[in-house]
Amino acid sequence: MSNKIKYNLKNVHAAIMTHTEDGGYSYETPVPIPGAVNLSLDAEGDTSPFYADGIVYFRAVSNNGYSGDLEIALVPDWFREKILKEVKDNNGVLIESNTDIEPVYFALLFEFDGDKKSIRHVMYNCSVSSRPTVEGKTKEESIEPGTETLSLKADAREDGLIKARTGSDTVDKTYQDWYKSVYVPEVTAEAQG
């Protein structure tokens, strides 16, 4: 049975992506990013109409992925080291410097609760487009936890793959193994045309 609603972002994970020698992709094992508060990713792309005979004769549509923000309680140290490329010194202090670095690409996995079953997602080719802001405020009469926000870009991989999500017909093993490894679709001869 299909969900009617979704709510409650949870189980955010990231898995670093690498290019393989044969031109493919591989992913490390997904690692949790605890403390998810909010995820907002806007679709990017264009439609370009071509007019002929007094009508829209053809319309080209492009899918340029997504961009937006992931708000979490705190960016984990492992994420700062492996993806933001901060360096831990001999005293265990994370150091950020202005050296030019290539962005680290990763898959972002997450889910929303549904009224029947959680909906699991994977964005295949993400990068951080800006470092988290450093901010805080004084404690007043009550403690209000602060959050940190990562600005993300989710582009298509070179093979065109952008994202996948589970649905009501998802095979149970695929659903249960979602966070064990990054799900990559199986392409059948029928699907290739």
Language model segments and positions:
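Acidic surface patches and DE-rich sequence motifs
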Residues: 20, 89, 157
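Mixed-charge, glycine-accented linear interaction segment located at domain edges/termini
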Residues: 128-193
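Context-gated lysine
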Residues: 4-6, 10, 82-88, 116-117, ...
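Intrinsic disorder/low-complexity segments
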Residues: 15-16, 108, 192
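Short amphipathic beta-strand/extended segments with alternating polar/hydrophobic composition
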Residues: 28-33, 120-126, 163-168
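Structured, beta-strand-rich domain cores
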Residues: 58-124
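Intrinsically disordered, low-complexity segments enriched in small/polar residues
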Residues: 5, 23-25, 103, 122, ...
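Solvent-exposed edge beta-strands and adjacent loop segments
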Residues: 2-80, 128-147
